[in-house]
Amino acid sequence: MTSNAPITPPIFDGHNDILSLLYDAGLSMAAPVDIDRFVTGMAGHLDAEKMRKGGFAGGFFAIWVPSPIDMDIKTTQMNLPVYDLPLPPEIALDKAVPVALAQAAILHRMEQAGYLKICTSTAMLQSCLDNGEIAAIMHIEGAEPIDRDFYNLDMFRRAGLRSIGPVWSRPNNFGHGVPFRYPSSGDIGPGLTDDGKRLVTYCDENGILIDLSHLNEAGFWDVAKLSQKPLVATHSNAYEISPHSRNLTDR
């Protein structure tokens, strides 16, 4: 008997925070990171079972260095009909690197446990899609762990990095993030710094995607002028639908 049930196409997700959630859970319990929570169950939108039920085929797994602010307060404020949150302060390189390395190691441990496959080429990605393996693209959200000479970037690339967002919603050596503000235009402040422009060129030359999410409008156009690769915003939305400072206008 033929089923009339709709077939769910495989979903490739633009962004998830599994790595930072696993890292933060280890800190809160003052214990080693338990990657098996990915299988046994995690709070939030994603874990192995939720992925299976939802047809999740793969996505961008973000390495993100949190700001030392009260995220609960921020989340509460962002539920208001109007809000304007100041940009968090910059995070120093020596503070960012250990956190980023730990989250990259978590992703590798998940691969070693057989939970997913870190993909560094389109051929690897297609193989995962064909064989039902979860495909993971290692992504850095906010380039705080990257030094001006890009030595760290070279090492992260060796570890599997294939995507980077120059900024999160805070300033760093490479650019100026857009604040969490609603309603608001994204045309807020300067774009990429000179180092940020060098970063775009270096990533273009080394097969690392530049993610436009969290850049302000000036930063978006800086990347558009410099990069010879397709423009990608992994987790931004349409400004005409929701006039948030992070969303993209029709222009």
Which residue ranges define each predicted feature?
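Active-site core of metal-dependent hydrolases
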Residues: 166-176, 181-251
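N-terminal hydrophobic targeting/anchoring segments and the immediately downstream early-domain regions
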Residues: 1-186, 243-251
